Amino acid sequence: MASLGTSGQSVTEYVVRVPRNPSKRYSLMAFNAADKVDFSTWNQARMERDLSAKKMYQEEEMPESGAGSEYNRKQREESRRKKYGIILREFKVDDQPWILRVNGKAGRKYKGVKKGGVTENASYFIFTQCADGAFEAFPVSNWYNFTPVAKHRTLTAEEAEQEWERRNKVLNHFTIMQQRRLKDQVGDEDEDEEGGGKLEKGGKGKKKKKKSDLKIHDLEDDLELSSTESENSDEEGESRKKPQKKVPAKGGKKKKRKSDDEALEDSDDGDFEGQEVDYMSDESSSDEELPGKIKPAKEEEGPKGLDEQSESSEESEEEKAEEEEGEEEKKAPTPQDNKKKKKGDSSDESETSEDSDIDGASSSLFMQKKKTPPKKDKKGGSNSSSRGNSRPGTPSPDTGNTSSTLRAAASKLEQSKRGTVSNTPAAKRLKMEAGPQNTSGKSTPQPQSGKSTPSSGDIQLTEEAVRRYLTRKPMTTKDLLKKFQTKKTGLSSEQTVNVLAQILKRLNPDRKVVHDKMHFYLKE
């Protein structure tokens, strides 16, 4: 120890010895501070080289001579590598990473990768102090960075790619389902808003709902047939035709609704009345028909099918013949009734009941308000009372001349109507069927209350009648029901359906589908 200079600073000198030919090579192990490596806890440590990459650098061993050898194989392989610029790397054991296991299998595992280029521009030395106080300096040959190895299994490159694709698939599915939920929520909100608006505008929503809930009695279920789909398709097609005609009216209606919404605050009582009129006019086009046109009964109303429009002239002639036969049967008992009229006043009750059927045509033509004559006891009844209680059209012995004139007028009207029916085409004749039925006197006239009492019936729903229709041409159940209407048969709609079902079961006709409709027919 020596003091140099006058400044009074103390300087300590050490002797450092560097070996010329070191027998050992020293390497540096660098750990990351974040790993918190504590060497004092290491009881056991083992290091070995990781030679797993040896297969990558290993060449295929081919025999140089003998079987399987190739002439100048090495030279050709080298020329190929030079041509494509392929540089082979030699497998050096010193360059392979270290595997460090601490405290056996239960401990941690580290992997040390060699850091290249450390000794190119700088030199690192390791100093060790000897017993005499001098230091020996050994140069560092290699530098290794050690990182802890994860215990859990990691994915390879291919497995990672598959998992990435699966992740994208899951995320896409999640986004699609989220969009669907949002759309459903928006759709529900829109429906709620539309429902509230319909209830505000004169209860239109309720009316439309009722219209959709209303279903006509399904005839096919009772008849055990399979033509329900055809009927539904017909109804849908006809309902589609109706809005096509009303397209301009709907456009104008939307404009009116918009204007009404804009001026809701300044609305008066008259605005709602206008809306109701629009709705009523749009509800059904039948209200806009000509006032002079005769409307059929409820059973006859409804859309006319294609089969009804395409009825042949033979069918119309057959119906005409049936009507004439019925009229002749009605007119046959007239001479017997005339003999009964010549009897005394005691038989007024029988006269009124029997002659009421004969004079039904004349009474239906000239009198609107008519009631069926109530029966009275023979003892207490008198001429005046029976005449007063009977219908205005019932003849009595005193009114023989008037009844004959009424019959003549009725017969003339029937003949004139027959001439017009024969001249009119088949399509018009179907619509005008209601007129001749009332004038022929086969059904009692309807009073003002709207209730009609069914008579004996023009057409009887029998097996022979159904057989005749089915042998003529194939017909659907709708067509058969239109042939046997309640007005003609005198039966209710349920009774006609049940009777027709039983008749079809007995006949067991052949079936065929034409234009998605089940048709029944019988072979002669």
Swiss-Prot record:
Stretches with biased composition (Basic residues): 242-257, 368-378
Bias type Basic and acidic residues, positions: 290-307
PTM statement from Swiss-Prot or TrEMBL: Phosphorylated on Ser and other residues by TAF1 and casein kinase II-like kinases.
Main subcellular location: nucleus
Keyword annotations: DNA-binding, Nucleus, Phosphoprotein, Transcription, Transcription regulation, Transferase
Region forming the signal peptide: none
Annotated Low complexity bias: 381-397
Biological processes, Gene Ontology terms: negative regulation of protein binding; positive regulation of transcription by RNA polymerase II; positive regulation of transcription elongation by RNA polymerase II; transcription initiation at RNA polymerase II promoter
Nucleus keyword on record: yes
Protein role: TFIIF is a general transcription initiation factor that binds to RNA polymerase II and helps to recruit it to the initiation complex in collaboration with TFIIB. It promotes transcription elongation.
Name the UniProt record assigns to this protein: General transcription factor IIF subunit 1
Underlying gene: gtf2f1
